[in-house]
Amino acid sequence: MSQKRVFTFGNGKAEGNAQMREQLGGKGANLAEMNLIGVPVPPGFTITTDVCNEYYEVGQEKIMELLNDDVMAAVKHIETLMNSKFGDAQNPLLVSVRSGARASMPGMMDTILNLGLNDEVAEGMVRKTGNPHFVYDSYRRFVQMYGDVVLELKPANKTDIDPFEEIIEQVKAIRGVKLDKDLSVDELKELVVRFKKAIKERTGKDFPNDPIEQLWGAICAVFRSWMNERAILYRKMEGIPDEWGTAVSVMAMVFGNMGDTSATGVCFSRDAANGENLFNGEYLVNAQGEDVVAGIRTPQQITKIGSQRWAERAGISEEERKAKYPSMEEAMPEIYAELDAIQNKLEEHYRDMQDMEFTVQEGKLWFLQTRNGKRTGAAMVKIAIDLLHEGKIDEKTAIMRCEPQKLDELLHPVFDKKALAFAKVIAQGLPASPGAGCGQIVFHADDAQAWHNDGHKVVLVRIETSPEDLAGMSAAEGILTARGGMTSHAAVVARGMGKCCVSGVGSLNVDYKAKTVEIDGVVYKEGDYISINGTTGQVYAGEVPTKAAELSGDFKELMDLCDKYTKLQVRTNADTPHDAEVARAFGAKGIGLTRTEHMFFDDQKIIAMRQMILADTAEGREKALAKLLPYQKADFKGILKAMDGLPVNIRLLDPPLHEFVPHDEAGQQTMAKEMGVDLATIKRRVASLAENNPMLGHRGCRLGITFPEITAMQTRAILSAACELKKEGFDPKPEIMVPLIGILNELKQQKAIIQKVAAEVFAEYGIEVEFEIGTMIEIPRAALTADRIATEAEYFSFGTNDLTQMTFGYSRDDIASFLPAYLEKKILKVDPFQVLDQNGVGKLVKYAVEKGREVRPTLRCGICGEHGGEPSSVKFCAKIGLNYASCSPFRVPIARLAAAQAAVEE
């Protein structure tokens, strides 16, 4: 064979090591490494991840043929080290068969224990051990596991009857016992017989007695489990590629169920929930590993302090705890001391928090696994900073140890985990904006405001949202929509506000008129309580308690470390002074995008805006815009003041005018009354604004060109606000950005208006403020002609939301109708509106930066689409030499960490 497919380990030697995760998976690599550093590990061998991929290419029979010689030699290796023989009734060897991908996937794939048992081997083990209860307990567990995993008899869902559990419950009921461990030897033997009979009835085949046949069945079953439903789902959630495959580790069995000097357990070198430097875990005396995980019996704590904390929470007295639930530290002090020493050794070796599995067989401790432990966002930050302080890792390693996306958990309200265990999931959507939201259902933005003002917490439920819903979204605890993807209006705005949002819930049937929403046949009406989880996309019936996220000193220290190494600045997308203040507190170095359209939806502003839209002469429009000017100036003044001394990039009006007018008759009647005109006039004007494809229609700079008075008013408002602030002793740094430029002459025309108004404003105030004029690169043609546009633009800001839409030809708001199929069929690997397409859209960005800087070497370039907060996109921005990335306030820390990691990785 050209490639090595099987690697052995045992007795302090190993053919692999910790650096071979890609070949041996995390489990196999760490089993080898533990051998090499002197940790007691049962001998065994690992079949590589490449074989898993071969299995799916050539099939089971060919794989068995390819592996046969190596596997048989590896079994012989275990036999030699254990001084026993696989399948020999006189001196039997049993093995476990376990999965192990290169990334930890806890509980996602399958394991088989006690493999090698048959009737003859069982009797031989009884003679050898003198412990028939242990032997037949192991035997019935093996037959059940083999039936579940290899013969695929485990029910597909929880409502179906498990044939093995049904038999166990029948036997326990006849005997009158509650726990499996209380069954007699004869009853355990009866279970084995009945299990085998159930297998024959369901498969038409006898349970395999040949241990070699059992072994091949188990190995191939573990490979099959790589593609089981839960493993596929987990990989999607964690971004683990399907092509990685799983390794298979076969190890000599050691038994935690051989009596009161035997035990099994799971432990962590630090607290995985909060990061506290406290050794902790659970163990069970006289049990096998799955008993701890399955929760059939109440496990006991490993440390005394852990046991005392557990008892206090459970309301158990110290006397009762010591008598009934002693810690391992108290009940098995010598084993505990060895366990504690080894867990310290493993953390020192791996320089990270370890998640370990162990078994004690008749007083001897064996380690079955170690891996870097899964942890919460809070624990992740604390552990990284603590390890830095302890001198175990350096600053760069501390930065790289933290996952940017997990910082989300620290920034938004979260559901109480205990309460979630009892919550009823009623729908699943897209996790559009993280956090937890709970409140009474309302269907209209006005109602959301009114209910909020009356002291109610509300969840705004919409088919989809629009800019008109902004105030209602702001008042709501969370937003739930039937349509829209991860970058729909609801999602983008919610993230900007730090609001929880679940979008694209196809099972929602919203009836605005009746003020009801039907979900899978159940009708929920206005005022009913629901809870939404923007981190998972789940929707729950009723109120699920939440708790506020608290930021630690460790978090601040991590962010300071990031600033020490980063080269790419992080700005924020902010439309209000509050957003700006939040982002600045999170470390934003300015504003990369202020959307002026969101400022127009207050009551008085929208009336003036609609008067401008209704006007059919430039004079009429200027009169209406004069009413808007003081409002706009006040808005800009607040934002520039909040970001004092830092740049604020303000985008001139971008959306089409139809978004500012009502489309329902009641709203149009109200508008007619406010405007002092008849309903027919309003209807005609609204109809005239309708466009077949508004995304590519009369919007952006096209509005400023057809209605130059809009550009003039907004420029006047921005620069007047800046002049007033400068006179008050502040240091405003405005940037005026012209949107949707595709042709150089568009920018020239708008720039002329801006410069003319600037001269007028500075003359009025008798003071000048430095400002820059730039453009948004969001049309492919603008990117391709960047060298020409840079002759007029002082900076580029890449609007990657629209650039992605126009490059792919996908509508951002409609992609949810086909994206799931594209992802499932692997046409797309990821949603291009969430993760920047580096091969297409990214190439346009890179090209535009290079061409622009050929003409203007000092050209500042940034990104202000939602990609600005996505870690891999931020790293790409750093790689191609952008000056900054801009994202919503609550994604600023994520982008700061990603930017620092990009610098460290260089």
Regions inferred by a protein language model and the residue ranges of each:
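Nucleotide/phosphate-binding sheet-loop regions of phosphoryl- and nucleotidyl-transfer enzymes
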Residues: 1-423, 450, 456-459, 466-471, ...
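C-terminal accessory/binding modules appended to enzymatic or scaffolding proteins
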Residues: 13-21, 433-475, 841-858
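Short beta->alpha connector loops at strand-helix junctions that form conserved
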Residues: 45, 482-484, 503-506, 594, ...
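Long, charged amphipathic helices and adjacent flexible linkers at domain junctions
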Residues: 69, 237, 399-451, 457-458, ...
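Conserved alpha/beta-domain cores
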Residues: 98-99, 551, 561-906
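Short His-Asn-centered micro-motif
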Residues: 251, 461-463, 481-483, 572-573, ...
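Glycine-rich phosphate/ribose-binding loops and adjacent secondary-structure elements
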Residues: 364-366, 459, 466-474, 486-493, ...
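A short, small-residue-rich loop immediately preceding and capping a beta-strand
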Residues: 477-483, 501, 862
